């Protein structure tokens, strides 16, 4: 009888320990949002290429190497006048995006999804949550960051849309410290009542320091040469960003002599306007071109598409 009682009390003790442990650990897991194995394997199961960059111990050299690796992962198809040309389209969801894993000195991580045909940011994951721009394609929303709690933001990824959340290029600092803070803010807003303005301002830093810097050697060098400082995009930087589509079109459709069919208006740092009429005038500033059909029969249609797109996002 005593032996049976001893076994009985042991069972009670074990059961009590199990229940308490489950409650405590379960609560702790929710507080810290520890990632599951499924979440950690998201990029692997999709077969997406991933490029990583950490602000911890970062130098301008590691930053430049990161941008070069990203350009390679985007897998441009051919070139125009020696400038790599991005893919025309992507039919395989598993190859339409590249993940950029950004981490900071605190170990906070944000995985940014980038479209390989345009270098546009479509969404990102922090902890067990993912967020997508309002205008992100359905293929991105449905196919990326599975096993996460998904949210469509009420604003898009265009500059005018970001400005609607008080995120302006002219007043946004760029550099290693702003990027570190941006990653931190994205991580801190992995909650139900997130702050749209903090997300928008943080994503604007990412867009400038990743997407735009990958497109333009000029912007890469601006950040590289002021890496440990805070800089803000001047008129020359903003005008290049706004005219990427038109520059790509003119370069792609120009003949062997590299002359543009139509001059492209740009601005200097002081806001003074000037015009470029040939590839050689802007080639040193551009690292990637957006695909534009070179066929004369479709080039006009392509130009109209670019003009329509740029009017939608607020570009000239």
Swiss-Prot record:
Highest taxon listed in the record's lineage: Eukaryota
Catalytic activity: Endohydrolysis of the N-glycosidic bond at one specific adenosine on the 28S rRNA
Keyword Signal in record: yes
SUPFAM superfamilies: Ribosome inactivating proteins (RIP)
Subunit structure: Homodimer.
Enzyme class, first EC level, given as a word: hydrolase
UniProt KW Hydrolase keyword: yes
Species whose genome carries this gene: Suregada multiflora
Stored PANTHER family: PTHR33453, RRNA N-GLYCOSYLASE
Annotated GO biological process: defense response; negative regulation of translation
Any matching Pfam family: RIP
Signal peptide: 1-26
Residues of the propeptide: 27-46, 298-316
Positions of glycan attachment: 235
Disulfide links within the chain: 90-96
Name of the featured protein: Ribosome-inactivating protein gelonin
UniProtKB keywords: Allergen, Disulfide bond, Glycoprotein, Hydrolase, Plant defense, Protein synthesis inhibitor, Signal, Toxin
